[in-house]
């Protein structure tokens, strides 16, 4: 039985991971949990899964959590704040840590887990996007496994099983196209928050659903694929696949193409990240190709999705630039969800922040450099958004790449 620590237990990734644990109690057990602010759900999870150690990100809610589980016996060790989440991530009994925390907040806990010798089921893509230059050397140093738990990178990882070194030519990431896949570009100025949160295929959290609508999510996945699989940006492509049945593909040196297919269900990549290299039999709905119907593809519209090209440009720059773009995006999406900037302002303010940071980019950043870049970008987005016209004028360097 594998002992698991779950970071972000009350979020979308966390609840689906717990569905798996509940369905396969002879395979997995939860020893540690960390969550944000949802005390009601967290207390229910503690009662059901009986973790040994729990952290809540908001220290002000620790006493309320204690009261909510006062009758639980035995009591888990309770911690709070960022330091508490980091301690849970490194907790001794866990073999694998599922990183379901949204955004760059997952970076420090993931690093702590790696240093403690835990295998990582990576559902927090920002860990690699912002921290790749630091995280990858630590993974190698501590001899842990970094297993992708999101659908696209899990698909690539599965397709690569048995492919000899040097056999991979190209990665093809599939994208649903998000909420505005079928909207004309001319209609995008009318986008509301409610519109952006209507994903056609997947059930996800608000931030990642907006990222899907801007296609920044796919741009971030390009950078993640670069770090995970060591593939140059020139050999990572994106294609719109509206049905979300093919989760990604690889092309081999002989032009053979391998793909991983399945219904849009995050539990499958999560399960594989926990069971690898084994396959666990499930009773989940099997893919019916006749029922799924046509599988279609189209080229992304660069005018509709400017975030996609921005991510390629920033990825090629390397260093701390991906951390800046990632943090700028997180802050911009938060402002959009608060209706403080428009949907079309999201790529504009992000590119403005990236343009302003370029001259101070560090190509071999330390963890401190990455965290400083992250904080700089968040503040810069607030500054840009408070100006009257947060409109970008792309730098020659960004435009030329």
From Swiss-Prot:
Q: Which residues bind 1-deoxy-D-xylulose 5-phosphate?
A: 125, 151-152, 176, 199, 212, 217-218, 221
Which GO terms of the molecular function aspect are on file? Answer: 1-deoxy-D-xylulose-5-phosphate reductoisomerase activity; manganese ion binding; NADPH binding
* Residues that hold Mn(2+) according to the record: 150, 152, 221
**Where does this protein act, in terms of pathway?**
Isoprenoid biosynthesis; isopentenyl diphosphate biosynthesis via DXP pathway; isopentenyl diphosphate from 1-deoxy-D-xylulose 5-phosphate: step 1/6
Report the record's Gene Ontology biological process terms: isopentenyl diphosphate biosynthetic process, methylerythritol 4-phosphate pathway involved in terpenoid biosynthetic process
Q: Which UniProt keywords apply?
A: Isoprene biosynthesis, Manganese, Metal-binding, NADP, Oxidoreductase
Q: Which reaction does it catalyse?
A: 2-C-methyl-D-erythritol 4-phosphate + NADP(+) = 1-deoxy-D-xylulose 5-phosphate + NADPH + H(+)
- InterPro entries assigned to the protein according to its UniProt record, in alphabetical order: DXP_reductoisomerase, DXP_reductoisomerase_C, DXP_reductoisomerase_N, DXPR_C, DXPR_C_sf, NAD(P)-bd_dom_sf
Which cofactor names does the annotation list? Mg(2+); Mn(2+)
According to its UniProt entry, the function of this protein is described as:
Catalyzes the NADPH-dependent rearrangement and reduction of 1-deoxy-D-xylulose-5-phosphate (DXP) to 2-C-methyl-D-erythritol 4-phosphate (MEP).
Give the UniProt family note.
Belongs to the DXR family.
| PANTHER family to which the protein is assigned, alphabetical | 1-DEOXY-D-XYLULOSE 5-PHOSPHATE REDUCTOISOMERASE, 1-DEOXY-D-XYLULOSE 5-PHOSPHATE REDUCTOISOMERASE, CHLOROPLASTIC
| Protein name as catalogued | 1-deoxy-D-xylulose 5-phosphate reductoisomerase
